[in-house]
Amino acid sequence: MGGHPAIGFMAALVIAPLLVGGLAVIADMTIIKRIEYDPERTIVATIGLLYIIQQLTLMTYGPEARPVEPPFNQRIALPWFEFGENGLEFYYPWGLSTTTYKLAVIGAAGAVLAGVWAMMRHTKVGLLMRATQADREMALAFGIPVERVYAIVFGIGAGLAALAAVLIVPIQQAHYLMGADPLLLSFIVVIIGGLGSLPGTVLAAVIIGLSDGIISVFFSPTLAKILATLLVGL
């Protein structure tokens, strides 16, 4: 999309979650529903879909990583502080800095998290989701369309993943395998945080994210992934 990078970026923020969420709903109704939402078969089926999508992307766009320009990217020096003779003093050690776009991504993640929490706690859709997750048979007895709820949840989850991909592409690069590392970390976060526990998942995500970033910078990204995977077995 021509013009300012912000135009294409804003369009992707809207189109990508809707498109991916819609495809996820279709996949749920045509594939996952047929295997009766069995956990093991669902994992195998969705991983198979992932490989198909990766190969289609490879054949369409090729193996080259493509940089994406962020809509804004001003650099900001990160200050530190100490208590000196004149009280609290700020200084800028080690040349640490970040960008306005990375700060915006952090803010967007917080906003999405708050939105998901509000939806789960204060909307009818969230009530249906929690009821279905707590007791599927009881939800069916009360007339809740469980399969439709499953499809909606799968679509929302896929849409949020697409939103995260749009936000992260300007920081990294667009590549047909760009989802591999986030997929591994998401499994680890969910297992450590606890299935169905939003606070536990958030806490696990913060811990894993910070440790992964620090270890990747000072040691190696591979070591960071190994240590994160080992945490699952503890």
Give each language-model segment a name.
Residues 1-9, 85-96, 171:
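Periplasmic/extracellular loop-to-transmembrane helix junction in inner-membrane transport proteins
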Residues 34-35, 42-122, 149, 214, ...:
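Transmembrane helix-bundle core of multi-pass membrane transporters
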Residues 94-175, 198-203:
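Helix-loop-helix "hairpin" substructures at the membrane interface of multi-pass membrane proteins
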